């Protein structure tokens, strides 16, 4: 039976390239030079600046470099800024994988559409199976048309 998997993954190389581009952009900006920094560890960024409005500008720089590298900004989760001594800091994490709640929403959305496919949760992915390839393509179109709050990819399409 034909099937495909619904996953939410980040390309780590593109993410590091986007962060490096954001750091270069930060060094080029005259108003932010020397006053701000971006530190990267795994899937977490720490933005450091003298004022909160600078953090917002840095966040915009990070978003624009993510978009240039074709990474969806929905996977980025910015926490509230906090004061650390004389500087302001902000944590930015990148979410990856489909959690249980989102997987349940995806399965419910497919079932509500009454397509001739079955969806099953398998860890951090959702497996969709059907009798015909056309039914699976309808399911992909249905999922692309709905906003789930996370970027979704469709892989392992098998006949």
Swiss-Prot record:
GO terms for molecular function: nucleotide binding. InterPro entries: DUF520 (IPR007551), UPF0234-like_C (IPR035571), UPF0234_N (IPR035570), YajQ-like_sf (IPR036183). Keywords: Nucleotide-binding. The keyword Cytoplasm does not apply. The keyword S-adenosyl-L-methionine does not apply. Disulfide bonds: none annotated. One of its GO terms (cellular component) is cytosol. Belongs to the YajQ family. Nucleotide-binding protein. NCBIfam families: PRK05412.1. PANTHER family: UPF0234 PROTEIN YAJQ (PTHR30476:SF0). This is Nucleotide-binding protein Pmen_0939. It comes from Ectopseudomonas mendocina (strain ymp).
């Amino acid at each position: 039976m034909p099937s495909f998997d619904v996953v939410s993954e980040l390309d780590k190389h593109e993410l590091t390239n986007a962060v490096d581009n954001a750091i270069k952009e930060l060094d080029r900006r005259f108003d932010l030079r020397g006053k701000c920094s971006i530190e990267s560890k795994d899937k977490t960024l720490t933005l450091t600046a003298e004022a909160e409005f600078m953090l917002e500008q840095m966040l915009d720089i990070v978003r624009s470099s993510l978009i240039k590298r074709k990474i969806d900004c929905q996977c980025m989760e910015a926490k509230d800024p906090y004061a650390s001594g004389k500087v302001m800091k902000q944590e930015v994490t990148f979410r990856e994988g489909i959690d249980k709640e989102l997987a349940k929403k995806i399965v419910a959305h497919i079932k509500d559409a009454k397509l001739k496919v079955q969806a099953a949760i398998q860890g951090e992915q959702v497996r969709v199976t059907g009798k015909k390839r056309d039914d699976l393509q309808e399911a992909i179109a249905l999922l692309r048309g709905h906003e789930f709050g996370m970027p979704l990819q469709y892989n392992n399409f098998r006949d």
